[in-house]
Amino acid sequence: MMTKKAITVLSGGLDSCVATCVYAEDYEIHGITFNYGQKSFKQELKASEEICKKMGFTHEVIDLPWLNKISNSSLTSDNEIPTLTHEELDDLDICEDTASSVWVPGRNIVFTSIATSYAESIGAEIIIVGWDKEEAATFPDNSKEFLESFNNMLNVGSPQNIEIKAPAIDLNKDEIVKLGDEIKAPMELSYSCYTGHEKHCGVCESCMRRKRAFKLADVKDPSEYNE
């Protein structure tokens, strides 16, 4: 019997780490990490490689220098990355402003399209992504509607039977941590910070959501923070 194959879009972050490990026992997993000039790429690459090594996945990097050139996102430019307080995490207006600052044009559309091409080339049945409910509130390309629409497009546009799988699509971050703890995903190897510092900065939105998630899940946070 042939082993089923999967592609995972792996940023090295908490969400993609846990989402990928949901399918670790049932698929031969091929990880891809995108380099689009983001400040955090070095740490994302380190985390992704370590996760793949520990879990026995293959891994490769896909360079997208043009995405950096057309983006004015604070993730890829000299613009300052916004910070948030714990209280501001639930203020939708503030979070929409910070989301606008870090938005990279068409990022998940591009990533998932390239992953589809890769999946077709190796005969993979699924593409794993870390999209989740909490981020979907301000990032439309993390939403269930986006997931369903992309899968509908694949049904029409791909000659192969490929499906995008987002096991965290109905989960908030703390629920993702609980799931990761349950399935023993190597969350200690993941990296979530926007800044790219060796230690998590502790104050960008991604770090704040990570810290809150572990606290609410009542799971020990393995991360090191500067603040």
Curated annotation (Swiss-Prot):
Organism whose genome encodes this protein? Methanobrevibacter smithii (strain ATCC 35061 / DSM 861 / OCM 144 / PS)
Q: How is the cofactor bound?
A: Binds 1 zinc ion per subunit.
Protein name, entry field: 7-cyano-7-deazaguanine synthase
What this chain does, per the entry, is described as: Catalyzes the ATP-dependent conversion of 7-carboxy-7-deazaguanine (CDG) to 7-cyano-7-deazaguanine (preQ(0)).
Q: In which pathway does it act?
A: Purine metabolism; 7-cyano-7-deazaguanine biosynthesis
Q: Name one GO molecular function term.
A: zinc ion binding
Q: Which family does it belong to?
A: Belongs to the QueC family.
This enzyme's EC code(s): 6.3.4.20
Any coiled-coil ranges, and where? none
For activity, the cofactor(s) needed are: Zn(2+)
Q: CDD domains, from UniProt?
A: QueC-like
The residues that hold ATP are 10-20
Q: Which UniProt keywords apply?
A: ATP-binding, Ligase, Metal-binding, Nucleotide-binding, Zinc
